[in-house]
């Protein structure tokens, strides 16, 4: 697994993908937080990180599939996937190595936004008038969300040899998992089932963590979704051995 992880992460670094992803994420979030009037912290009149944690998931929804779309699709198209599968590596070594390298890149893109937190902290009146617990909970949620999107992207890449198709499938699945169930639950036809339906979606658990209360049920939900997507990837990858 370590070999695959190092190979994938070095590929990111050598192809400039890592630098592009981090730059695009920080620039996009920076513009939303400090420049664009409708979302700027400076126009809110109070210190708040809501822009990052509300719009960040939608930025990641496109950015992460762009990272993961090549992970299996490129190897399938080049015919190197069979060579990879013949090496003394288990399917899980390959899957986890690729997943962890992608997730690490996402984390490295998110961590520099702590600079924005420091800026907002200093802008508070008085300085420090920020819901730090909520911010930390939101960061945990955003990092776990990045892991879910990475696992979705990896699965999408495993079912096709076309990177563009992989990207489109991943964006669609991420969007459905993030907002789909919440939108479905808002339709006034489900009655008492609407609450249950809402809890199936990512945004319900993500918003719960943003309140600063790290409930084990929310954490279990995220990891369950990650495991599910990696299991589906394992099934697809395993089918190529037969």
List the model feature ranges, each with a label:
Residues 30-34, 46-59, 101-161:
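Secretory targeting signals
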Residues 91-92, 163:
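Alpha-helix N-cap/start motif
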Residues 16, 22-24, 101-110, 169-184:
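Hydrophobic alpha-helical membrane-insertion segments
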Residues 1-63, 115, 217-242:
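Hydrophobic alpha-helical transmembrane segments
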Residues 39-50, 166-236:
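Terminal transmembrane helical anchor/hairpin motif
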Residues 65-85, 99:
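Transmembrane helix boundary and interhelical loop/hinge segments in multi-pass membrane proteins
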Residues 66, 70, 114, 118, ...:
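Transmembrane alpha-helix boundary and packing residues in multipass membrane permease domains
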